[in-house]
């Protein structure tokens, strides 16, 4: 039976856990340090890693002298993985259309922001700007429209006319690729009126 080393938690997903444990020998290494994980993956065939729990980048050095032939990540980005072996990512997969956890986490962070400032604000009086209007941006718009006074969007080929004038909170949902690095700089921030 093939072995999967889980560098990040997976047991909180009962259906996934049941399915994967019926097909593979699963090693839960999520509570170990990076060094302990590196030592423990020696006999595994695959690695599983979710970026929101991982505190380091998986590199060729990390998997050197192991049997690891593939890295699996339940994520749309792979900036936490830099290896020469195959990486399976679910970016643009239809299964993502019904997974709202990242959008909900984004909302949670937005809800916590006003509570961590000296000036308490009510979101129903504020405008949300969504930078990046792909799958995640559309989900955020859907769950935030009932909460914010207005929601404005901006993407590669379109920006709402009031986006820079009215945005109080900015949700950044662009993918990590070379052309987006440095996109949010002082010049970009200076476009906002509030």
Language-model-detected regions and their locations in the chain:
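Glycine-rich NAD(P)-binding loop of Rossmann-like domains
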Residues: 113-140
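N-terminal glycine-/charge-rich "phosphate-binding" loop or analogous flexible N-terminal tail
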Residues: 1-46, 150
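Phosphate/diphosphate ligand-binding glycine-rich loop within oxidoreductases
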Residues: 45-118
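Phosphate-coordination loops involved in phosphoryl transfer and adenosine-cofactor binding
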Residues: 1, 124-127, 194
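NAD(P)-binding Rossmann-fold cofactor-contacting core
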Residues: 146-160
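Short acidic/histidine-rich motifs immediately flanking catalytic phosphotransfer sites
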Residues: 40-46, 66-69, 165-170, 193-194
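Aromatic pocket-lining residues of Rossmann-like dinucleotide-binding sites
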Residues: 143-144, 192
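Rossmann-like adenosine-cofactor binding region
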Residues: 55-62, 156-194
């Amino acid at each position: 039976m093939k072995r999967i080393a889980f560098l990040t938690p997976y047991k909180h997903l009962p259906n996934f856990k049941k399915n994967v444990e019926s097909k593979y020998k699963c090693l839960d290494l999520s509570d170990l340090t990076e060094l302990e994980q590196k030592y423990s993956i020696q006999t595994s065939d695959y690695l599983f890693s979710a970026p929101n729990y991982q505190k380091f980048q998986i590199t060729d050095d990390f998997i050197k002298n192991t049997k690891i032939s593939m890295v699996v990540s339940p994520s749309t980005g792979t900036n936490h993985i830099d290896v020469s072996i195959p990486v399976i990512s679910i970016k643009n997969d239809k299964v993502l259309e019904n997974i709202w956890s990242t959008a909900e986490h984004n909302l949670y962070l937005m809800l916590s922001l006003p509570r961590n400032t000296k000036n308490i604000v009510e979101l129903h009086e504020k405008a949300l700007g969504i930078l990046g209007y792909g799958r995640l941006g559309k989900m955020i718009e859907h769950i935030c429209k009932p909460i914010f006074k207005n929601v404005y969007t901006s993407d590669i080929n379109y920006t709402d006319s009031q986006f820079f004038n009215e945005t109080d909170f900015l949700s950044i949902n662009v993918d990590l690729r070379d052309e987006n690095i440095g996109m949010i700089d002082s010049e970009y921030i200076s476009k906002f009126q509030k």
